């Protein structure tokens, strides 16, 4: 029997149900590493938020804990995108790479920094995320986490952004040369209110 390269369209709902037997039936005719065709990201099974039981089943089936989607993002990148940081420690425990880089050369910590929640950044660093990482993308150029924090230069997020900046700097993150320009722009926005 020839195995499918793609996952059933309702795979995310099946995983959400937490029913390991239903998932086993749904993927029995799928290759290891099969992807979701309807997604621009070409998500693999490990990319969907899942219970420990589902995660264990998928790993026992042979799925890769560090599988890559179309943009080279890993399941840990995916958990950041889905705002399911609570599942990251288990992925790390099972071999997930918290410092894996995607096609933009960014680690999952860049995604957490983008949401500007210092408590989440602190968790990621405690779990092993490197705050000193510098992404070097052909599309976006070089980016430090401190620079990425201020890239939108929004006064509305200034308090949260500055909390994240302070946290990153306290953990040895390099300073981006664009920070002073971003801070001046945020201050200019503040003065116009």
PLM features per residue range, with description:
Residues 1-48, 53-57:
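N-terminal segments that cap or nucleate solenoid repeat domains
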Residues 1-13, 127, 147-193:
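Ankyrin-repeat-protein effector appendages
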Residues 4-11, 35-47, 68-75, 101-108, ...:
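Ankyrin-repeat boundary/"N-cap" motif
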Residues 13-18, 44-52, 78-84, 111-117, ...:
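Ankyrin repeat A-helix N-terminal signature
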Residues 22, 53-54, 86-87, 119-120, ...:
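Conserved ankyrin/ankyrin-like repeat signature
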Residues 25-32, 56-64, 89-97, 122-130, ...:
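Ankyrin repeat domain, specifically the short helix-to-loop turn at the C-terminus of the second helix
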Residues 64, 68-117:
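A generic tandem-repeat structural signature
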Residues 104-163, 167:
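Ankyrin-repeat and related helical/solenoid repeat scaffolds used for protein-protein interactions
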């Amino acid at each position: 029997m020839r195995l499918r390269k793609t996952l059933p369209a309702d795979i995310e709902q099946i995983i959400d149900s937490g029913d390991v037997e239903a998932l086993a039936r749904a993927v029995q005719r799928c290759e290891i590493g099969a992807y979701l065709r309807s997604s621009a990201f070409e998500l693999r099974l490990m990319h969907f938020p899942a219970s420990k039981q589902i995660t264990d089943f998928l790993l026992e089936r042979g799925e890769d804990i560090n599988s890559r989607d179309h943009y080279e993002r890993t399941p840990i990148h995916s958990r950041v995108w889905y705002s399911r940081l609570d599942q990251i420690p288990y992925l790390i425990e099972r071999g997930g790479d918290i410092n894996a880089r995607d096609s933009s050369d960014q680690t999952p910590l860049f995604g957490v920094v983008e949401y500007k929640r210092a408590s989440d950044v602190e968790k990621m660093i405690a779990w092993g995320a490197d705050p000193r990482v510098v992404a070097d993308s052909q599309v976006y150029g070089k980016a430090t986490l401190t620079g990425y924090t201020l890239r939108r230069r929004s006064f509305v997020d200034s308090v949260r952004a500055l909390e994240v900046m302070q946290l990153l700097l306290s953990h040895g993150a390099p300073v981006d040369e664009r920070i002073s320009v971003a801070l001046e722009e945020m201050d200019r926005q503040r003065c116009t209110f």
